[in-house]
Amino acid sequence: HIGVIRVLEQERIPVAQVVGTSVGSLIGAIYASDRDSFDLEWTAFQLEQDDLFDFRIANAVMGMGYAKGEKLEAFVKARVKHENIEQLQVPFAAVATDLNWGERVVLDKGSVAKAVRASSAIPGIFEPVLHQGKLLVDGGVVDNIPIEVARARGADLVVAVDIGEKVGNTNIKGVVDVILQSTNIMFAVNTGFRRQGADVLVTPNVDGVGMLDFTQKKRCMQAGIQAARDAMPRLRAAIEAKKAKKAKELAGRG
């Protein structure tokens, strides 16, 4: 995600709004706070697993997940300059899943940190988050690449970033591996039929980088940059096509 944003900045292509699910909501919220990919990169490269995950055995035995998610929420509060989504510099929405009813929930008002925590609450890993009267888990359960949400919020041209890894995994050794691999399969199936709605789809090569892998940040950043560079001709063409369509519509009205 960060590498893609960096290239958009370098190419002077403005980001009019950000809609994110799971880690996309985390990256998106930090960027929406100050529109600075270098600050975003610095934050990401300092980030370690212990900054986000408050694992407790008691949670796993008696709760609804291995981690409560309080560390993740505190991390967002410390890194995002604004408390509420309405205050962010870039219009922003996080996507979560209503665990009771299996419905997509768009969080575009209220606490930034709570919205990101809910959107990133991987089932079984993080406890569900009670927010705005709903019990919420990771948005990827129902919509891992929220193109429809961006369209509904008025996006004219949607650039979607798909960081899903290939589902093959022969190194499953424990219950956490089972949860993560099951989630990965679910996300992959979900993404497969949703991503076709994007004007431009960017697919960084992050195969082999797991959901909880914090050791390959530089590789992921470079993969995002390369994928965005590869997609740039398609993005430029899409921008010109939108401009031509608008010009034609205006001429027709005249």
Q: What label would you give each PLM region?
A:
Residues H1-T21, A29-G254:
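Patatin-like phospholipase
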